[in-house]
């Protein structure tokens, strides 16, 4: 196998306009390719979402790669320097929607599997891939549903690598070994609409909420710890008023979000918000939505193996980090003993002219192969 195979597979995937939750047969392509080296494929589709569980072997330990074939919309196509679904090599980079997030990672792991199986046909344990077409969307019928199926039948993962783009300045310089939780609130502050010249006949919800808002934004929710920064509270939207300048609004709508560390809990944060609102006499309705709990993989075998593979291939020392947004790792951690995220540069994800460095592609595949070898080869390498 030559080093161009990862690039060619990445191009084949990028050329399929799989805007979430559309898969455009990307998973079929992966299944056909991996079938040739002994992977069994199980389709687990829910609604418009396509998921596939691919596995070679029946024994532990199970090394799983998790990824998604869906991509975000392109944005204005005319602003791209080349068509977003026509993978283009230019200036030492591969351009196309999904190049970084995350079709290159998928391609690199598949080719890593091909080389590893050719070298170690009787490897220990099992290799698996969990691929969904619903990561960039609502993420309701994707990985979370597959995890439910696997959990129900007692199918666990020992080591999981999520192929999200994690590199900052150079391939391999960062490994995500955890993520913060995400808790959102949709708050409706109740008032009484009236003429702005007669405030005594109305209740201005903006005014009643203002003291509570100040306290919420100044509250220290926790101090964080050695793995996580302090929990953050951010207002994303505030809407009130009719648009007229002479009407006191009858209600105020506020949307906010917590990114919380393992030092806080979903229940605890909710209780503290309600206590602050009640303290200031705010009349309100509040709806909550938690899209993920914080999780952490402590430094151990998987992080050690990954850092060694990166050092040998890329010549850099990987930093362990929990920064950034959420990923499907938040679902998989329920059945995975150790989980990390490791992929190409995240500098252009979701942007116009999304791209990856061409010379990073064979390196990433080599990193994945070294990880497989150190975890599953017949003999330690």
From Swiss-Prot:
Stored Pfam families: M20_dimer, Peptidase_M20
Assigned keywords, A-Z: Amino-acid biosynthesis, Cobalt, Diaminopimelate biosynthesis, Hydrolase, Lysine biosynthesis, Metal-binding, Zinc
GO molecular function: acetylornithine deacetylase activity; cobalt ion binding; succinyl-diaminopimelate desuccinylase activity; zinc ion binding
Listed InterPro entries: Bact_exopeptidase_dim_dom, DapE_proteobac, Peptidase_M20, Peptidase_M20_dimer, Peptidase_M20A
Active site: 70, 135 (proton acceptor)
Reactions catalysed according to its record: N-succinyl-(2S,6S)-2,6-diaminopimelate + H2O = (2S,6S)-2,6-diaminopimelate + succinate
CDD domains attached to this UniProt entry: M20_DapE_proteobac (cd03891)
Pathway it works in: Amino-acid biosynthesis; L-lysine biosynthesis via DAP pathway; LL-2,6-diaminopimelate from (S)-tetrahydrodipicolinate (succinylase route): step 3/3
Name of protein: Succinyl-diaminopimelate desuccinylase
Upper classification of the organism: Bacteria, Pseudomonadati, Pseudomonadota, Betaproteobacteria, Neisseriales
The keyword Endoplasmic reticulum belongs to this UniProt entry's keyword annotation: no
NCBIfam families (UniProt xref): dapE_proteo, PRK13009.1
